[in-house]
C-alpha cells in the first residue's frame, strides 16, 4: 500500500508530529511519498530528515521565486506551459475553485504536472491542505483517497474559518475521511455539517520507545522551568513571562528556558527586557530534537500555558506535553482546547485557567515546594495516560488499518 502525505509546506521544524507520522509509516513498511506545495525550512531540521532521506521522497509543487509579482509571473508561465491540457483550463474556473483559481495556484500546478501523482490514500495535514488536495484530485493531478487531519488553527481561527468554512463543507462531500485529533474538534466538524460516518478521532501521539521514564526528582533550587513551543500567541508564553515577573517579585528562585522560534519572538524578548528578567529567562531559539531531549533531562517542570488567540486560534492537544509526560517531567498547562483530554487536573499534571498569570505563578511557586512522594503518583499517572491513549505506535497502527479499509 502506498501512502502519500499532502502538505502545504514541508519540512517545518515546529511540526515534529508530521515528521514522526511520516517516519512511522515508513517504519511500518508502507511505500511513502510526500507531496508539498511549498518547500519549508531545510536548514533547521530534525535528525529524521536526513536519516530517512526525506528530501528524496518529496515532490514540491510550487518551487516559486519570492515576491508577489514574481510569483504571479511564474504561475502564469507554468499555466501557459500546460494550456493545451484540459485540466489547466478547468483549474481557471473561479466559481468552482475560488481563490486558488484566481491566484493561479491550481492552474500552475496543472501546467507542470504531466503524470498524475498516485497513492492509495493521501493523508493531508490541516484542513486547508485537505481542501487543496481534493481540488487537485478532481483536476486529475493526484489520484487516491484523501484523509484530512484537523489539528487546531485550521478548525479554530476566525480568519481561517471565515475563509474555509464553505471550502470545508465541499471537502466533507469530496473527501473520504476527516481525522480530528480531539473529541472537541470531532464535535465541531459535526456542527459544521460533516457526516458522523466520515469522522474518526485520530490523536497525535508519541513514540514511547524513545522516552524512558527518568527517576522522580524533587524540584531543584533554582526551579528549572522549560517550554518547548513555536513562538506564537496561542502558546501563552507572554503569560508565562508575566508569571515569571511575579515569581521573581515573590523571591522564588527559578530559571526559565523557552526553546523555539516563531513570529512572537521579538515581542517575547521585549517583554523579558521590560520586566528585567534577562537573568532568569532565556530564549536560545531552535534546537534539534536530540538537544531538546538533553535540556529536558535537567528540567523540573514543563510549562505550556496555552491560550485562545485574539483571532480564535487554539491548540489541538500539544505533542510537547505528551513527550514531557512520557519521560516523567511534571507538566503545568491550562484549561484550554483538548488539553484536559490529555492532562487530568491534579491527577496527571496541573491546569490553571487561560490568561491567568497570577494563578500560574501560584501554581509554580507551590510546585517548587513539592517532594518526591507527592510527585511520584502524578508522574506515574501521566506516563500511563500517554502510554494508553497517546501511544504513537498504537495510534499509527490503528490509523493504517482505518486507511486500508477505506
Residue ranges and their predicted role:
Residues 280, 359, 366, 373-389, ...:
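A short, well-ordered alpha-helix in the C-terminal region of glycosyltransferases
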Residues 267-290:
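Nucleotide-activated donor-binding/catalytic signature segment of Leloir-type glycosyltransferases, i.e.
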Amino acid at each position: 500500500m502506498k501512502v502519500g502525505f499532502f502538505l502545504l509546506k514541508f519540512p517545518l521544524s515546529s511540526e515534529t508530529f508530521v515528521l514522526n507520522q511520516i517516519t512511522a509509516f515508513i517504519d511500518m513498511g508502507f511505500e511513502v511519498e510526500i507531496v508539498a506545495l511549498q518547500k519549508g525550512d531545510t536548514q533547521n531540521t530534525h535528525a529524521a530528515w536526513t536519516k530517512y532521506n526525506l528530501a528524496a521522497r518529496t515532490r514540491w509543487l510550487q518551487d516559486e521565486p519570492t515576491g508577489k509579482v514574481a510569483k504571479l509571473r511564474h504561475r502564469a508561465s507554468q499555466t501557459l506551459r500546460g494550456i493545451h491540457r484540459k485540466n489547466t483550463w478547468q483549474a481557471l474556473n473561479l466559481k468552482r475553485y475560488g481563490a486558488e483559481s484566481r491566484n493561479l495556484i491550481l492552474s500552475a500546478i496543472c501546467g507542470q504536472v504531466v503524470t498524475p501523482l498516485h497513492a492509495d490514500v493521501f493523508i493531508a495535514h490541516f484542513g486547508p491542505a485537505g481542501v487543496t488536495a481534493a481540488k487537485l484530485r478532481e483536476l486529475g493531478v493526484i489520484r487516491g483517497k484523501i484523509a484530512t487531519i484537523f489539528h487546531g488553527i485550521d478548525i479554530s481561527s476566525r480568519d481561517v474559518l471565515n475563509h474555509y468554512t464553505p471550502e470545508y463543507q465541499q471537502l466533507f462531500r469530496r473527501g473520504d475521511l476527516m481525522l480530528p485529533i480531539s473529541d472537541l474538534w470531532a464535535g465541531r466538524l459535526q456542527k459544521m455539517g460533516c457526516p458522523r460516518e466520515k469522522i474518526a478521532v485520530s490523536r497525535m501521539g508519541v513514540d514511547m520507545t524513545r522516552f524512558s521514564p527518568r527517576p522522580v526528582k524533587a524540584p531543584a533550587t533554582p526551579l528549572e522551568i522549560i517550554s518547548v513551543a513555536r513562538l506564537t500567541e496561542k502558546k501563552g508564553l507572554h503569560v508565562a513571562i508575566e508569571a515569571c515577573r511575579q515569581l521573581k517579585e515573590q523571591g522564588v528562585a527559578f530559571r526559565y528556558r523557552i526553546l523555539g522560534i516563531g513570529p512572537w519572538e521579538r515581542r517575547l524578548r521585549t517583554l523579558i527586557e521590560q520586566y528585567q528578567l534577562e537573568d532568569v529567562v532565556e530564549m536560545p531559539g531552535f534546537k534539534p530534537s536530540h538537544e531538546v531531549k538533553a535540556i529536558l533531562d535537567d528540567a523540573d517542570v514543563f510549562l505550556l500555558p496555552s491560550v485562545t488567540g485574539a483571532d480564535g486560534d487554539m491548540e489541538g492537544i500539544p505533542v510537547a506535553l505528551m513527550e514531557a509526560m512520557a519521560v516523567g517531567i511534571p507538566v503545568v498547562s491550562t484549561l484550554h482546547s483538548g488539553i484536559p483530554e490529555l492532562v487530568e487536573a491534579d491527577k496527571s499534571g496541573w491546569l490553571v485557567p487561560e490568561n491567568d498569570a497570577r494563578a500560574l505563578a501560584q501554581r509554580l511557586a507551590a510546585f517548587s515546594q513539592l517532594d518526591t512522594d507527592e510527585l511520584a503518583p502524578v508522574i506515574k499517572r501521566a506516563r500511563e495516560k500517554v502510554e494508553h491513549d497517546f501511544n504513537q505506535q498504537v495510534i499509527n497502527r490503528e490509523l493504517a488499518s482505518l486507511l486500508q479499509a477505506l
